[in-house]
A protein has these predicted regions:
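N-terminal export/assembly leaders
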Residues: 19-29, 93-98, 112-146, 168-176, ...
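Short beta-strand-centered interaction patches in the first periplasmic/extracellular domains
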Residues: 63-86, 129-220, 299-306, 318-330, ...
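Oligomerization/assembly interface segments of phage tail-like spikes and tubes
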Residues: 22-39, 72-85, 211-213, 377-395, ...
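Acidic, small/polar-enriched beta strand-loop surface segments
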Residues: 184-378, 398-421
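Surface-exposed cap/loop segments at beta↔alpha junctions
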Residues: 41-130
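Short solvent-exposed strand/turn elements
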Residues: 71-94, 323-341, 434-453
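Solvent-exposed edge beta-strands and adjacent loop segments
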Residues: 1-28, 61-64, 187-203
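Short beta-strand-centered aromatic/proline hotspots
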Residues: 56-66, 307-317, 420-429
Length: 457
């Protein structure tokens, strides 16, 4: 029996129908369509809740109810896990004094900074519920824009941008790819865990053996490789792999975050002028690499100014000192200012200049390596195989073992030549008989895509 509550009050005690299942997906849904009958009419409201299979589920939509005969009321309640609360909270930017600003905005930082802002927004609406961060991937710096997203949408944006996944367990939010080996071997046979198995490609995208690959249009010499306007990998703007095996399958890919750059670090700031700072190790004179009629700019990667771009007013290579203009795009919040300013240790890169050949070559090599990784992933059959599995309920009833989303299991099917480890990316569990499972096994959920990385050259 399932007890449905509103606050501390019991609204109804119901017996779920045999077909009711718990549905979970990696970086996705966690819901139950709770169907049941009552001999009387009961009104249910949004955010009524119930404890089901050890988790709290909330009614998020007006329920469906029908009446058959004089006394039989049939209900279906769409209930979601704790993550539904994130969909109620706008993902807003905040400043150092706790003021929140409307979208759009962007941040340039590591995953932990984004997740800290996410948590602050959740606590803004649900201040005393014990929400906290769990594991957060140790990431590169990313520049990510947000426009009218709630916290659940923002969490999915972060998972995609940092090439990882999100997981909410109770009221703890994780941003990482869970890799928990269970030791369970799924195979068919008397007393084994597997009842039926279907193997299929995760998507129908073609392999690629010739990839036309491009980077950003920033910081390129003029002319560049016969008039090309974007970074590429050589005189021929493509990479070939496995053509002898598969023939020619062409595609193209652009990595906008890869371009010739040097990551500078502030070593001192002028105490009398927050617009002036020094990088004692800056390696080249940018005044010799300016583009006619184009203002050189710099973008902060870390620190209070992370994500902001500034025109360079002047540069003195003798002292390796930069002077920048204020960023006045937001008239209500011009930067730098007394609260948000450059500090020693902040990192930045200069753009809208022409970098020397050495930096261009390094960027081309980084682009080539990224393209090879992309092609290898596209062409690896094991990356694209997915398995739909119906589990043997008698096995799980006898052993007491449970399956959890994102856990890894081994699939063994000798006749099909299958012996591989895969993760549970979708999981369906019967509520009345929790030893009945069906699941989908793959390396990654379908919606996870390759994203661009910022390269330090």
């Amino acid at each position: 029996m399932i007890t449905i509550k509103r606050g501390i009050s019991i609204i109804a005690v119901v017996e779920p129908m045999d077909t009711v299942t718990q549905e979970k997906e990696v970086s996705g849904g966690n819901f139950i369509n709770l169907s049941f009958e009552l001999p009387y009419y009961r009104e249910f409201k949004r955010m009524d809740y119930a404890e089901i299979l050890g988790e709290t589920y909330y009614l998020t939509q007006i329920p469906t109810v029908s009446k058959e005969g004089k006394r039989d009321y049939q209900y279906t309640l769409s209930m979601e896990g704790e993550q539904c609360k994130l969909g109620r909270v706008e993902f807003l930017q905040s400043n150092l004094i706790g003021q929140y600003f409307k979208n759009p905005f962007f941040i340039n930082d590591k995953a932990e900074t984004f997740m800290t802002l996410l948590l602050r927004n959740i606590e803004r609406v649900f201040p005393n519920e014990g929400w906290k961060l769990g594991y957060v991937v140790d990431s590169e710096i990313k520049n990510i824009s947000f426009d009218n997203q709630n916290c659940l949408e923002a969490l999915s944006t972060l998972a995609e941008a940092f090439d990882t996944e999100w997981l909410i367990k109770g009221r703890t939010i994780h941003l990482y790819r869970k890799q928990s080996a269970t030791g369970l071997v799924m195979k068919q046979g008397e007393g084994e865990a597997l009842y039926s198995l279907e193997k299929k490609p995760q998507d129908n995208s073609n392999i690629v053996t010739r990839l036309y690959v491009y980077g950003s249009d920033k910081n390129l010499p003029n002319p560049y490789r016969r008039g090309l306007t974007r970074l590429t990998v050589g005189d021929l703007p493509y990479i070939e792999r496995q053509i002898e095996e598969y023939g020619i399958w062409e595609d193209s890919k652009t990595f906008d975050d890869i371009f010739p750059m040097n990551l500078g670090t502030i070593t001192s700031v002028d105490s009398g002028n927050i617009l002036r700072f020094t990088d004692a190790n800056f390696p080249f004179d940018i005044t010799t690499q300016l583009i006619p009629e184009v203002k050189a700019k710099l973008s902060f990667q870390t620190g209070q100014l992370a994500g902001y771009e500034f025109e360079i007013s002047s540069y003195n290579h003798t002292y390796k000192t930069f002077t920048i203009n204020k960023n006045t795009q937001d008239k209500a919040w011009e930067v730098p200012n007394a609260d948000i300013k450059p500090e020693v240790g902040d990192t930045f890169f200069v753009f809208d200049i022409r970098m020397s050949n050495a930096w261009v070559t390094a960027a081309e090599q980084a682009l080539r390596q990224k393209a090879i990784e992309y092609m290898d992933q596209r062409n690896d059959p094991s990356e694209n195989d997915t398995y739909s599995v119906v589990c043997n309920p008698l096995y799980f009833k006898r052993t007491g073992k449970t399956l959890r989303i994102a856990d890894s299991v081994t699939i063994e099917e000798p006749d099909m030549g299958i012996l591989t480890q895969k993760r549970i990316v979708k999981l369906s569990r019967n509520v009345r008989q929790p030893f009945i499972y069906t699941c989908e096994l793959a390396n990654r959920p379908k919606k996870n895509v390759m994203v661009k990385l910022l390269q330090q050259l």
